[in-house]
Every structure is written in C-alpha cells, then in structure tokens.
C-alpha cells in the first residue's frame, strides 16, 4: 500500500482568506440549519457560529431562491462561505456568481459533461475550489454492484473518478471528503484516500446523532484520523444547535494539541473529599473560557491538599476547600480567596493572562 500523505504535505488550497492543506492547521467548519433564502436568519446563525470559533461555514442550496441569496449573505458575513450543490449545476453557477468561496458537489451527479465544464470554468474564473463530497450512503450504483455494499475501496474509487473528471478539465483546486456514519468504515476510507492522492481532506462522521451520541462517535472517528496525521479541515455533524458542533470541534483539536489559540479546562472527576460545588463551578469556567482565543490551561479542582500539585501543568487554577479556595499558577499557590469570590478572582486572572497573550500577538505583527 502507498505511503500515507500527512496533512502538512497535502496540496494547499485557498478558501477565501484561509489556506487548507500544506500545513498542520485544522480548519473548523459547520453548516447552517436555516433556510438559506432567509437571509436574516442565515446571517444571524453564521455570526453565532463565527463567535463560537467556526472558520468556514456551509449553506444548503436546494433551489434557485437559495442560490440567489448567496450574494447578500456573502456581503454580511466575515468567514468563507461554502455552498452545497446537488444535481442542478445552475445553482452552482449562480452561487459562484454571488461570491461563494467554495462549492461542494459531486461532478458525477450534476448531469452531462457540459454542465461540469460550465461549473469548473466559473470556479476557475473566480479562483475558488470545489469539494468532492463522497458519502457511503450515496455511492454510484455501479460501485455498489461491483463491491456488493459500501466499502472503503468503493468510496476511494468514487473519489478518484470525480477527481479525474476535474483534472481532465485542468482543475486542481480540490478538497475531498469521505463521509460515512460507520466509524470504522470512515477511518478506513480516509486512510486509503490519504494514500491515493494528496488533495486536502475534509473530515466528518455523517449522521453521527444527537449532541451526546454524536459527540462520542465523532470524537472516536475523527480523533483516530487526527492522531494518524490525516485531515485538514473538519465538521462535527450533530443533530443539535450547530454552535455545539463548533464547541466539540475546538475541544477535540485541543485534545491533540492542534488548536493554537484556545483555552483548555482541567477539572477533577469529583470524590467524597470535595466540599465545594465543583461541577457547577467547572461548567461556569468552561463557558467563560470558550471564547478566549489564547493558549491558556485552566484548572478547577476540588481538593486543596492535592489540587495544586496535580495541576502543575495548568497556567492558572483554583482548588476548593471548606469556605475558601487556593488560587495557584503553575502549581504554586498565589493566595487564598474566599469561596464566594474565588470564581470571579479566577476569571480576573484568566483575563490578565489572555491580555498578555494578545499583547504579544500585537507586538509580533508587522507594522
């Protein structure tokens, strides 16, 4: 079997102001749940997603009304916009004309070759990429007849077929996804894809389920791929508010040290020694740091005896005791604080560390 292409060695592809591939960065994506023709609702949801840390957003384009809304949506958002096209190539042309930063299609399902040529020509003129979205649930009939059922080899063959269509038209700004709802199938398909071509891979476990089940399933599948060095961009697909997809994605990337500017929470699993409401405190602190774009490690621990030593790697933290808390930095106790104010004191110190990071970033920027 061919050698696996590591994410940093994939072909770089520009999507708006971002580059996907050719580096170790993983770009977080999500998808709106609104009707795309409802511009107000769609823009509002995209803004919420951006605030949560989404870097690229995708919208459905099931009809011409949605395609015609792209130009107005694009004017009112800050992050790159991907438009999802199925079957009708005219929707793709209208979306590209409206300023889409990328389109997602299967070249094989938008009709005759002239249709594909028209879409590729429009994408070339605007300098935007195309994502080939292979899905185990919608493989071509001849592949299902050949393999008997959806397999990783069938998915890779489908991807290569669609890639070949674009390459024959001298188009190489391609991103590929290999989605399946079965975790093991998805892992195998992405692994084989990473050995078959060097285009960037968009990771996802499709139809993964509700917030709880989908988070576990996506973390299992995407986490395995990230550890293997596979993937340049990802979406956590959940039957939930899409903001939750972004939160899970950020947390997953933090677990692998792949989120450069994100705060991380350490909290103990609780036991009989705890004398503070650690669970609610941990949830409050987690929510507080979710929007902080600085690599700060924060600890919330329930035991003042072992806490500071156990969280020596944390930049800042609190350990609760009866009626008071210990504020510590890098495992060293800084001061005691009353229990009723210890969370606010922790937040103040987090803000100071974040501001120090932001100041360093500003200093490093060229004038």
Swiss-Prot record:
Residues binding [4Fe-4S] cluster, per UniProt: 268, 271, 303, 310
Keyword Magnesium: no
Cofactor binding notes: Binds 1 [4Fe-4S] cluster.
Pathway: Isoprenoid biosynthesis; isopentenyl diphosphate biosynthesis via DXP pathway; isopentenyl diphosphate from 1-deoxy-D-xylulose 5-phosphate: step 5/6
Matches recorded under InterPro entries: Dihydropteroate_synth-like_sf, IspG_bac, IspG_bac-typ, NO2/SO3_Rdtase_4Fe4S_sf
Keywords: 4Fe-4S, Iron, Iron-sulfur, Isoprene biosynthesis, Metal-binding, Oxidoreductase
Disulfide-bond pairs as recorded: none
Family per similarity comment: Belongs to the IspG family.
Function description: Converts 2C-methyl-D-erythritol 2,4-cyclodiphosphate (ME-2,4cPP) into 1-hydroxy-2-methyl-2-(E)-butenyl 4-diphosphate.
Protein's name according to its UniProt entry: 4-hydroxy-3-methylbut-2-en-1-yl diphosphate synthase (flavodoxin)
Species assigned in the record: Shouchella clausii (strain KSM-K16) (Alkalihalobacillus clausii)
Gene that specifies this protein: ispG
């Amino acid at each position: 079997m061919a050698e696996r292409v590591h994410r940093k060695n994939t072909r770089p592809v520009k999507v708006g102001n971002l580059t996907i591939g050719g580096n170790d960065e993983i770009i977080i994506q999500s998808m709106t749940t609104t009707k795309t023709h409802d511009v107000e609702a769609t823009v509002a949801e995209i803004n919420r997603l951006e605030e949560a840390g989404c870097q690229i957003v995708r919208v459905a384009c099931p009809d011409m009304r949605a395609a015609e809304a792209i130009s107005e949506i694009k004017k009112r958002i800050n992050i790159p916009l991907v438009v999802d096209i199925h079957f009708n190539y005219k929707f793709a042309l209208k979306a590209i004309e409206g300023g889409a930063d990328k389109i997602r299609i299967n070249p094989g399902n938008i009709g005759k070759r002239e249709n594909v040529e028209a879409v590729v020509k429009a994408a070339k003129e605007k300098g935007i990429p195309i994502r080939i979205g292979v899905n185990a649930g919608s493989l071509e009939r001849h592949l299902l007849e050949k393999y008997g059922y959806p397999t990783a080899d069938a998915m890779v063959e489908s991807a290569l077929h669609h890639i070949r269509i674009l390459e024959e038209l001298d188009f190489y700004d391609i991103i590929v996804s290999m989605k399946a709802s079965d975790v093991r199938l998805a892992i195998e398909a992405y692994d084989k894809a990473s050995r078959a071509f060097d285009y960037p891979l968009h990771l996802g476990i499709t139809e993964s389920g509700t917030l709880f089940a989908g988070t576990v399933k996506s973390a299992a599948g995407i986490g395995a791929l990230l550890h293997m060095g596979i993937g340049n961009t990802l979406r956590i697909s959940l039957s939930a508010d899409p903001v939750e997809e972004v939160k899970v994605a950020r947390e997953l990337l933090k677990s692998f040290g792949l989120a450069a500017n994100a705060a991380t929470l350490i909290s103990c699993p609780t036991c009989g020694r705890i004398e503070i409401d650690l669970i609610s405190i941990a949830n409050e602190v987690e929510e507080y740091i979710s929007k902080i774009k600085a690599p700060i490690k924060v600890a919330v621990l329930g035991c003042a005896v072992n806490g500071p030593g156990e969280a020596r790697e944390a930049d800042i933290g609190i350990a609760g005791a009866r009626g008071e808390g210990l504020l510590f930095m890098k495992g060293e106790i800084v001061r005691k604080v009353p229990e009723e104010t210890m969370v606010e004191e922790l937040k103040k110190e987090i803000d100071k560390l974040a501001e120090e990071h932001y100041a360093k970033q500003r200093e490093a920027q060229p004038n």
